[in-house]
């Protein structure tokens, strides 16, 4: 017979082809050829071999099954006439063209549809190729056809294209919605500016006409003006955002003195700094001329300073420095002594609508747009902004702006801006109101019997407004957040709690929840005042915990009316509860107990009835057998499933005991387990055992046995649940047999790979035997014969023949077909044989082999041949990995030792190869998983099977220094 010796052609220009030479196959290769055929037919994908004219020679079994044909039907016939291509005439003609192209020497590869599933009735898509194979004279002698099923891939690609199209449509829709939102903001902002102008203008006229701060209405005018200015600032911000989103925001460059601008802006915060005892340090040079948009520069400084004042505690320090930075940039730094900004939030604070939630700060006020506007204004100037830790703690903002406008930009010569006039800059737009005296969390001295009202509101202006509305008729005290309110309520419970929802430290809904958890506050009515139009939350709070919910803005008259109703209901409820508590508590208590006892009895009867119904349903319909026995193991009842499993009828089982259904060799153990169960008083146990059926067969089962709690005056009953696992046991035995056959096949394949090395190892002692035999003949033929030299030659012949015999013994033992034989293993002999096998392949691949075995190795039970196969597989993997890369030093270390507790053998195979990627370590031992270009990916899976047969473990590691380590742990006897 002939075989193909495949090797790459010497002519490098002939890509995607192989050279072959024909030779006579030795009979020793028959078995290997059979194994190769098994592997060929076992391939899942399409593989076929054609002659040079495209006629079928060989096709693997998976491809034949897919088309519903046999090899005999198509062998010797044109490949394009086979069942796979009979989709249409075009498919047949196309395949014929592909075969002709490959026959002319062209490598063909394309995606194509074939009849390759359900016996040729279903079309699948395959990645198809035809590879020309040449002989040593460059003549094409074979065509290798290969195909990989890519139907799922094609479907996934089509689905991905559809999803991408849907995503593009969604992105376009979002873009349109975003543009519509920006247009809406711009239009609404324009519409709001008109009524705000009509509020602020007349208000300013009225305040000028009043007699200064001595007027009784002056404070109310200030509140109106301050909040109107705040609203105007938010409107302007929204308008700026709309312009920036529409890319319509431009810069009006002017030559300005940044020192003067910054000095004027910072001076407007002097009054606020004095109120809060904050030191404002403005370190500015005499002059620093730059070309900037003065209005936007002012907004940058105002936002940074107001942000610093928000988070700086009373008595703190704020620094505002301006300096020249090279090349040609101005550097503005604003730092504070507040809590600072965590590292992980420093990018987020410049995002729109992001607010920094710091404990104790009013995080819920504002829109979260200030720093976003600052960043966008800075970037419009082609500058940068960053945040870091201030030297003494707190936050440090650094803004770097170029001194000169971009080339070609128009720059006005006048350096004036509206910020040059201190009267036009209003920092109140950017700061939270400063709490006035008496507006904090204080417990007043209650002087009368008027109802008490606790107001919880974080905005000082709103807090003062509500207090002024109610202080005439009620004793009012206030708190800025939920935590302070709880403290005040514990000291002086109110008759009514009025709370906002969005507050720092503790929100209003959290406060409501905590108040309702305390029994002493159960009868206190709660009113929510909120600007949050959340209908779902409003309904939830009204249905569960609060008595009223009023949306801002509201009128003072409506507030007084609602408060009056709640206070009246509270007073009436208190009076009624006091009256009821004076009635006969003994009768009420007795009635309550009787009702409760009757209710418990009814519930017990209902539960008992339901439990019995559920038990009956489980008993009759369970797939597992259920048996009730007495303490002597006599069968009292058996459900239909147990009758079906054993083949006995209910009448038959009533005459039997579980002991009679148990095989004789298991009865003693069964009696002992039952005795321990009765002695322990109910400790359930589970066991795998077997039972005798009526037809004489034996079944395997998992049995769970426990004691049932007996009713009064009833005997003890034992519950046994029998789960039939006979089919599972048979499947496991079949699986074990298949695994052993796979191990044997792998062992033969491994020895096939070693054939050349083994031949070399045997040839060496045989050559030495021939040499020494010739020498001995000459010594004996001398006159006189040289007996001493002849004896030494004979001794060397004996030594070399022993060496060859050892190799042959090792090979026969390794290839011996038998199941695993567990017996004590001679580890020293195993190590010696393994070293002998690995010596030749290590040397031929330039690998330094180092085998280390401890002096005292643990005694283990196992199959020595399988353990040796496991180690050889791991070692050959390492040798192959190192030979495929350019390692400077190729070292393979095998170590055999005990673990720390001396109860297991640890085998370590370590190499200096390329190592194993972390994402592949978890998949290495899966069947058919491989990182090689060739191979089935079964080697490491077989190693895992061998380790598990010996109750051991195998795992891989990739050390930081490089290479790979495989560990095997086999427990002692």
UniProtKB/Swiss-Prot annotation:
Pinpoint the PAC domain residues.
108-162, 685-737
**GO CC annotation terms, alphabetical:** cytoplasm
List, for all copies, the residue spans of the domain called Response regulatory: 452-567
Catalytic reaction(s) noted: ATP + protein L-histidine = ADP + protein N-phospho-L-histidine
Please give the InterPro entries that the UniProt record associates with this protein. Answer: CheY-like_superfamily, HATPase_C_sf, His_kinase_dom, HisK_dim/P_dom, HisK_dim/P_sf, PAC, PAS, PAS-assoc_C
Q: Which cell locations does it reside in? A: Cytoplasm
Which residue ranges traverse the bilayer? none
In terms of SMART domains, this protein maps to: HATPase_c (SM00387), HisKA (SM00388), PAC (SM00086), PAS (SM00091), REC (SM00448)
Q: What is its EC number?
A: 2.7.13.3
Q: Which residues form the Histidine kinase domain?
A: 187-405, 757-973
Report the PANTHER family cross-referenced here. HYBRID SIGNAL TRANSDUCTION HISTIDINE KINASE C, TWO-COMPONENT HISTIDINE KINASE
Q: Which NCBIfam families match?
A: sensory_box (TIGR00229)
**Main role?**
Member of the two-component regulatory system TmoS/TmoT involved in the regulation of toluene degradation. Probably phosphorylates TmoT via a four-step phosphorelay in response to toluene. Can also be induced by benzene and ethylbenzene.
UniProt protein name: Sensor histidine kinase TmoS
Which species is this record about?
Ectopseudomonas mendocina
């Amino acid at each position: 017979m002939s075989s193909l010796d495949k090797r790459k052609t010497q002519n490098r220009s002939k890509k995607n082809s192989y050279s072959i030479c024909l030779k006579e196959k030795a009979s020793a290769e028959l078995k290997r050829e059979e194994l190769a055929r098994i592997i060929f037919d076992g391939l899942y994908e399409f593989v076929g071999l054609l002659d040079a004219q495209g006629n079928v020679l060989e096709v693997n079994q998976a491809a034949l099954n897919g088309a519903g044909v046999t090899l005999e039907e198509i062998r010797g016939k044109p490949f394009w006439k086979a069942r796979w291509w009979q989709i249409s005439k075009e498919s047949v003609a196309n395949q014929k063209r592909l075969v002709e192209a490959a026959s002319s020497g062209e490598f063909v590869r394309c995606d194509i549809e074939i009849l390759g599933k359900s016996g040729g009735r279903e079309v699948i898509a395959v990645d198809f190729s035809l590879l020309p194979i040449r002989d040593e004279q460059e003549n094409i002698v074979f065509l290798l056809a290969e195909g990989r099923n890519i139907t799922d891939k094609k479907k996934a690609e089509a689905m991905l294209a559809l999803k991408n199209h849907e995503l593009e449509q969604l992105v376009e829709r979002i873009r349109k919605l975003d543009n519509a939102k920006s247009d809406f903001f711009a239009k609404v902002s324009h519409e709001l500016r008109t009524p705000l102008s009509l509020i602020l203008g007349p208000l300013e006229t009225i305040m000028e006409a009043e007699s200064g701060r001595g007027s009784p209405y002056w404070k109310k005018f200030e509140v109106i003006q301050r909040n109107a200015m705040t609203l105007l600032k938010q409107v302007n911000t929204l308008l700026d955002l709309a312009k920036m989103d529409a890319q319509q925001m431009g810069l009006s460059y002017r030559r300005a003195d940044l020192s003067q601008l910054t000095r004027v802006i910072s001076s407007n915060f002097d009054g606020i700094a004095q109120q809060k005892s904050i030191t404002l340090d403005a370190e500015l040079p005499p002059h620093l001329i730059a070309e900037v948009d003065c209005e936007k520069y002012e907004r940058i400084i105002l936002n940074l300073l107001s942000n610093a004042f928000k988070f700086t505690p009373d008595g703190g320090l704020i620094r505002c420095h301006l300096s020249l930075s090279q090349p040609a940039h101005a550097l503005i730094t604003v730092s504070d002594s507040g809590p600072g900004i965590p590292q992980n939030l420093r990018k987020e604070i410049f995002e729109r609508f992001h607010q920094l939630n710091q404990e104790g700060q009013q995080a819920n006020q504002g829109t979260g747009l200030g720093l976003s506007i600052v960043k966008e204004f800075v970037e419009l100037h082609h500058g940068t902004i960053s945040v870091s830790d201030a030297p003494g703690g707190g936050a440090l903002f650094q803004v770097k702006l170029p001194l000169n406008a971009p080339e070609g930009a128009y720059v006005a010569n006048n350096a004036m801006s509206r910020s040059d006039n201190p009267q036009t800059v209003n920092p109140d737009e950017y700061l939270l109101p400063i709490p006035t005296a008496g507006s904090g969390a204080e417990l007043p001295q209650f002087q009368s019997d008027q109802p008490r009202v606790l107001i919880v509101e974080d905005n000082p202006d709103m807090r003062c407004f509500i207090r002024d509305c109610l202080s005439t008729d009620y004793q009012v005290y206030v708190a800025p957040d939920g935590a302070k309110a709880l403290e005040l309520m514990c000291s002086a419970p109110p008759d009514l709690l009025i709370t906002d929802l969005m507050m720092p430290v503790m929100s209003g809904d959290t406060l409501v929840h905590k108040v309702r958890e305390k029994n002493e506050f159960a009868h206190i009515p709660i009113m929510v005042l909120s600007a949050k139009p959340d209908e779902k939350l409003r309904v939830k709070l009204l249905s569960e915990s609060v008595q009223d919910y009023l949306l801002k803005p509201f009128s003072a008259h409506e507030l007084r009316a609602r408060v009056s109703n709640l206070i009246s209901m509270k007073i009436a409820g208190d009076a009624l509860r006091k009256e009821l508590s004076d009635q006969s508590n003994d009768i009420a208590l007795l009635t309550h107990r009787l009702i409760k006892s009757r209710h418990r009895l009814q519930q017990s009867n209902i539960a008992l009835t339901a439990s019995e119904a559920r038990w009956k349903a489980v008993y009759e319909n369970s797939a597992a057998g259920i048996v009730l026995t007495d303490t002597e193991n006599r069968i009292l009842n058996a459900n239909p499933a147990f009758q079906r499993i054993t083949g006995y009828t209910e009448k038959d089982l009533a005459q039997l005991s579980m002991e009679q259904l148990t095989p004789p060799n298991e009865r003693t153990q069964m009696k002992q387990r039952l005795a321990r169960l009765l002695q322990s008083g109910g400790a359930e146990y589970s066991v795998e055992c077997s039972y005798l059926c009526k037809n004489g067969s034996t079944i395997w089962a998992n049995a769970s046995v426990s004691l049932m709690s007996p009713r009064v005056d009833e005997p003890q009953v034992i519950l046994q649940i029998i789960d039939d696992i006979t089919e599972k046991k048979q499947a496991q035995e079949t699986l074990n047999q298949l695994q052993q056959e796979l191990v044997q096949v792998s062992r033969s394949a491994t020895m096939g790979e070693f054939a050349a090395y083994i031949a070399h190892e045997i040839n060496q002692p045989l050559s030495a035997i021939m040499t020494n035999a010739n020498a001995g003949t000459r010594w004996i033929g001398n006159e006189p014969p040289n007996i001493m030299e002849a004896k030494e030659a004979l001794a060397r012949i004996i030594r070399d023949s022993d060496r060859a015999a050892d190799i042959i013994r090792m090979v026969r033992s390794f290839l011996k077909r038998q199941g695993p034989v567990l017996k004590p293993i001679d580890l020293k002999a195993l190590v010696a044989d393994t070293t002998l096998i690995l010596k030749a392949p290590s040397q031929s691949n330039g690998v330094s082999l180092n085998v280390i075995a401890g002096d005292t190795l643990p005694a283990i039970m196992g199959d020595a041949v399988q353990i040796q196969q496991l180690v050889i597989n791991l070692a050959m993997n390492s040798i192959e990995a190192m030979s495929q890369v350019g390692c400077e030093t190729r070292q393979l270390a095998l170590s055999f030792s005990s673990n720390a507790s001396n109860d297991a053998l640890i085998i370590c195979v370590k190499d200096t190869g390329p190592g194993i990627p972390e994402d592949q370590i978890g998949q290495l031992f899966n069947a058919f998983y491989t990182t090689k270009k060739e191979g089935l990916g079964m080697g490491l899976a077989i190693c895992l099977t061998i380790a598990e047969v010996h109750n051991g473990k195998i795992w891989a590691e990739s050390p930081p220094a490089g290479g790979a380590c495989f560990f095997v742990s086999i427990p002692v006897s």
